[in-house]
Amino acid sequence: MRGSTFLLLSIVGIYGAILNAAAWSVNNFLMTGPKAYLTYSSSVAAGAQSGMEECKFQFGWERWNCPESALQLSTHNRLRSATRETSFVHAISSAGVMYTLTRNCSLGDFESCGCDDSRNGRVGGRGWVWGGCSDNVEFGERISKLFVDALETGHDTRALINLHNNEVGRLAVKATMKRACKCHGVSGSCSIQTCWLQLADFREIGNYLKMKYDQAHKLEMDKRRMRAGNSADSRGATAETFHHVHSTELVFLEDSPDYCTRNASLGHHGTEGRECLQTGKNLSQWERRSCRRLSTECGLKVEERRTEVVSSCNCKFHWCCTVRCEQCRQLVAKHFCARRDAAVANHTKRRNKGHRR
């Protein structure tokens, strides 16, 4: 039993150690465990990894940028937290695992799973019927739940929050699914369509959950009942709090720090030394403001550094059949957050106190 538990804890890639390239090798944790776990473990690992990569993309220009040290979410971790950021990590990891299991099921990677054809032949709407090969999200949801939710063995508030946010991630996969259709009819008239459901691009799920992160709900617990030491009273307070929370809403318990300052014990690296964006093509308004958010509002200055970038250029096709390119060097201006005079920095941070992350 302990071996199976260790496999579950190891395989779900929401721990910092798992993000290490060497530790990420599936072979590292296929030493034990039931056959069912061995069947799906590589998909679970790949799904958790894709969730972490999406987290880093979504928070790339935020003060908290999804660092590896912040992803050690074991409920047995003494430093575990229940912040807004933790809620997103649980949701995106859970979504990544479900997404990959569902996709690999449709690709025929598992003997025990195939398309969801349960609705095939039924009328779906005016001019179309269910058919084709719908992605089997019920399968992905069921297996991902076995792996991801097994991390939470406790019954305390933090464990319940983590389980809730795991479910938000799984519901996000369902909420973003797309209907795809194929036309049928004489001479391409499309008099009737056959339609099926397919997974959205994972980036869309990331965007959806980022929106949920921005709208996340802070739980206000009855602290007197929580401190009373009565487990039944504590469970009652928790149940009452969750009664008003929607199933698709991310929740958190603790306010986040400003993430400006380095705190090694908590795994916060601060923003000093981080790159930020000021100029460039196709930058969003949020990206253009990254220097203000990461530097100015954190009491740092923006420092421009010129970096040499080497790229292939002047490529030509030679018969037959190679492409030869030259190596071009170009100086590119990049901007970084740097320390400024202490007095100026303290004045700036006081002035910007209260700004949103």
From Swiss-Prot:
Secretion signal: which residues? 1-16
| Glycosylated residues in this chain | 104, 263, 282, 346
Q: Which GO terms describe its cellular component?
A: extracellular space
Q: Which SMART domains match?
A: WNT1
Q: In which tissues is it expressed?
A: Cells that form rhombomere 4. Hensen node and the neural plate immediately anterior to it.
Q: Name one GO molecular function term.
A: frizzled binding
Query: What name goes with this protein?
Result: Protein Wnt-8c
Q: Which gene encodes it?
A: WNT8C
